[in-house]
Structures are given as structure tokens and as C-alpha cells.
A protein has these predicted regions:
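Acidic/hydrophobic-patterned starts of short beta strands in beta-sheet-rich repeat architectures
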Residues: 42-51, 93-102, 153-162, 203-211, ...
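Short, small-residue-biased leader/transition segments that mark boundaries at the very start
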Residues: 1-6, 382-384
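Beta-propeller blade termini
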Residues: 32-42, 83-93, 143-153, 194-202, ...
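Beta-rich catalytic cores
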Residues: 31, 55, 82, 87, ...
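Beta-strand-rich domains and repeat architectures in extracellular enzymes and scaffolds
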Residues: 23-55
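Beta-propeller blade repeat segments, especially FG-GAP/WD-type strand-to-loop junctions
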Residues: 7-18, 56-71, 111-129, 166-181, ...
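Solenoidal tandem-repeat scaffolds enriched in leucines and small polar residues
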Residues: 125-129, 135-172, 179-220, 229-231, ...
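Short loop/turn motifs that recur once per blade in beta-propeller domains
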Residues: 16-29, 71-81, 127-140, 181-190, ...
Length: 388
């Protein structure tokens, strides 16, 4: 009954997504934000990590058709902190992915509680920031997003923290110490950080695109492990917009990543690299302003074409299929419309190993709502051009 306030009744013939929210055990209304995917306990299976804003952080594991919270250690669930962002990657090359929880108990500037950087010793989690050697490098600035960056291409990840009203952080492990290298790398800019993504955008290594609010976006070119800011040179600065969710996608199916980025109640962008400049090829339907929070690009229905999921807060979500030549075709999103959904984050993973991606959406901010979970209804009889 509680979940009916989020979803809409749509005939089966119109559904792109099947609603499988019933698979989530003990799915109570709550305030959630960012979602990540990781093998939390190194058991060979992925979990959805869901942040809680004054609620437990969750590690949703799959077993026999059910998603259940698999971690109950107090340092992980951290109910008394307000967690807004999460990323997971192996920063020390020990085979376990560390988990960075970004806490934000104030809108902007200085905050009370620092972030968590959780390591797993095979039995329990511990916070690397609680070690005395790392106390001088705590992030005590409000933030919005966090992403892992393999800047040297050697598998030793760093963590970029998009702060709001304070300098950007870039944490790496140096010996036994967690060091903020943002100043050394020249990326300690002060802005209204909102979203951040990393991948091979321009160089052969991990570049960084950061969508910001009340200021220009950043595009960092990875020059042998150092960063050069080129947003204005490549025409992705979008100075007068308020950036939100962003994703990387091979929009032209040509073997290179381009940038999908959104703006709060402003035009959404599909930046494609042409002649050493990014050109926005978004059509009227795709670019239509909305109260957007998250953008995801993935092939949900295994037809060889990527879909773009746009998660809005307080208004309907949208779904587009990227066809050949960068054509965006809006498709009926079906059960995942969520007209009254207060979307704050989302992630995709093949959580049950059946070869089809699940979509998990988190909600909150202005009201308590449960998580929702969707799976594409694949029509096997329909031909697919790209997979023949």
C-alpha cells in the first residue's frame, strides 16, 4: 500500500519494466540517497550499497529471489550520520574494494561529521579515517557525490569527492596513510559540486567530468596521471546551468565514450565529441528541463541498444533508447514512471546473475519512501538490429 504512492497502474502491454520491488525484504519507507554496486564481503556476489540519510546504510544481497540487507555492523550501517554518496573501489590493491561513504549534515561548507572510508579485513569493517595517522586529512566539508578514479592506470584507485562550498578532495593511499592529493594535482577547486563521473573520455586513462551548480562544470584530461582542466576548451562548461546526474555512454556506438549530463530544471545534454569539441546533440524531448537527480545509461533489454534512464524527483521519470546516429527515441517507461516518486539515486547491476540488469531506485529528501526495483521485460520475438 505504501509503494502504490510511488508507482502507477499501467497495462502490461505498455510496460518496459517489470516491477519486482516485492523481492526487497523489509523495504520500509526511509530517506535514501546514493547507490553503488560492489562485492562488499568478497564472496563473489555483488550487492547494492544504499546510503541512508539518518537511516541505516544497506548492503542488499540476492539469494533465492530475495534481496536482503547482509551487513549489520554498526560502523557500516552508521544510522546517526547522514550519508548522501557512496563509491567502492580497491585503493590498496589487496583484492577487497574499500567503501567511501560521503556524509553531509549541512547544506554547504563545514560539517560536523567526517566521511567514512571502510576497509574489510575478511571478518569485519573498520574506518581508515579513524586511524590516528589519517585524522589530519578528514573531509569536513559538505559534499554531494564521490567517484573512484584510476589516474595512473595501475589499478590503485583514488577517490574524488565533489564538495559543496569547499575544496574538492582526492584521496589516495600512500603507504599506510590516506592522503588528500587534490591540491598537488591542481583539482582542489571550490564550487557547488553535484555529480561526477570518471572514464576514458579524452585520454587513454581515467579522465573526470564533474557537473556543478552555481558555476562551470569541470573536465579533467588525464595527462600521465596529472590533470588538466579543459571544460571550456571542449565546450562542456555549461556555466549558467545547475548540473545534476551524469553518465558516460557510447552514443554513436563508435567505440568511444561521450557525456550525458543533466541540469536542474534546465536543458539536459548529450555531448558528443566532434572535431575536438563536444557538441550537444540532444533533441527537444531528451533535453526538456526537469527536476532531475540521476542519469543512467545501460542496455536494459539486451537488444544491443543502450537506454538512458532519467530519474526525477517529484515528477515522472523518463526513458530513452539510443538508436543509430545518435537518435534518442523516448519509450514508454511503464511501471518505473513513478509520477510521485522522490527519486534521489539509482544504480544498475545483474544482481541475480540471470544476464539481465536490475534497476534499483532510491527515494527520500522531502519525504519517506521505500526503494523500488525493476527488471526489463524482454520481448525475445522482436528482432534486434545491433545483435542481429
Amino acid at each position: 500500500q505504501r509503494q502504490m504512492c510511488i508507482r502507477d497502474s499501467i497495462s502490461k502491454s505498455d510496460d518496459f519494466f517489470e516491477d519486482i520491488t516485492y523481492q526487497i525484504l523489509e523495504n520500509q519507507p526511509r530517506l535514501s540517497y546514493g547507490v553503488s554496486v560492489s562485492d562488499v564481503n568478497n564472496d563473489g556476489n555483488f550487492e547494492f550499497i544504499v546510503t541512508g540519510f539518518g537511516f541505516n546504510n544497506l548492503a542488499l544481497a540476492h539469494k533465492k529471489g530475495i534481496l536482503f540487507n547482509s551487513i549489520n555492523q554498526s560502523i557500516f550501517i552508521d544510522k546517526n550520520r547522514k550519508t548522501i554518496g557512496v563509491a567502492s573501489c580497491d585503493i590498496d590493491q589487496d583484492g577487497y574494494e574499500e567503501i567511501y561513504f560521503l556524509n553531509t549534515d549541512t547544506y554547504s561548507g563545514n560539517k560536523r561529521y567526517s566521511d567514512r572510508l571502510l576497509d574489510f579485513d575478511g571478518n569485519k569493517f573498520f574506518d581508515l579515517f579513524e586511524l590516528e595517522i589519517n585524522q589530519k586529512n578528514l573531509n569536513l566539508t559538505a559534499g554531494r557525490s564521490v567517484v573512484c578514479v584510476d589516474r595512473n592506470g595501475n589499478g590503485a584507485y583514488g577517490i574524488y569527492v565533489a564538495n559543496y562550498g569547499g575544496p574538492t578532495r582526492f584521496y589516495e593511499k600512500d603507504g599506510n596513510e590516506i592522503i588528500d592529493k587534490a591540491s598537488e594535482l591542481g583539482i582542489d577547486k571550490i564550487t557547488g559540486g553535484r555529480a561526477v563521473i570518471s572514464g576514458n573520455i579524452l585520454s587513454g586513462r581515467s579522465d573526470i567530468f564533474a557537473a556543478n551548480e552555481r558555476g562551470e562544470n569541470f573536465l579533467y584530461y588525464n595527462n600521465n596521471g596529472n590533470f588538466v582542466e579543459l571544460a571550456k576548451d571542449y565546450a562542456v562548461d555549461d556555466t549558467f546551468q545547475n548540473g545534476r546526474g551524469t553518465a558516460l555512454s557510447d552514443i554513436y556506438y563508435r567505440g568511444r565514450l561521450d557525456i550525458l549530463t543533466s541540469n536542474w530544471e534546465g536543458p539536459h545534454r548529450a555531448f558528443v565529441l566532434k572535431n575536438n569539441k563536444f557538441v550537444d546533440i540532444a533533441d527537444k524531448q531528451f533535453s526538456a528541463p526537469s527536476r532531475i537527480r540521476t542519469v543512467i545509461s545501460a542496455d536494459f533489454d539486451n537488444d544491443g541498444y543502450d537506454e538512458v534512464f532519467m530519474n526525477n524527483i517529484g515528477e515522472p521519470n523518463k526513458l530513452f533508447k539510443i538508436l543509430d546516429n545518435g537518435e534518442f527515441k523516448e519509450i514508454n517507461i511503464g511501471n518505473a514512471l513513478e509520477t510521485n516518486g522522490l527519486g534521489t539515486g539509482a544504480a544498475v547491476a545483474d544482481i541475480d546473475g540471470d544476464g539481465i540488469l536490475e534497476l534499483l531506485i532510491s527515494h527520500g529528501e522531502s519525504g519517506y519512501q521505500p526503494l523500488t526495483l525493476y527488471l526489463s521485460l524482454i520481448h525475445i520475438s522482436e528482432p534486434t538490429r545491433r545483435l542481429n
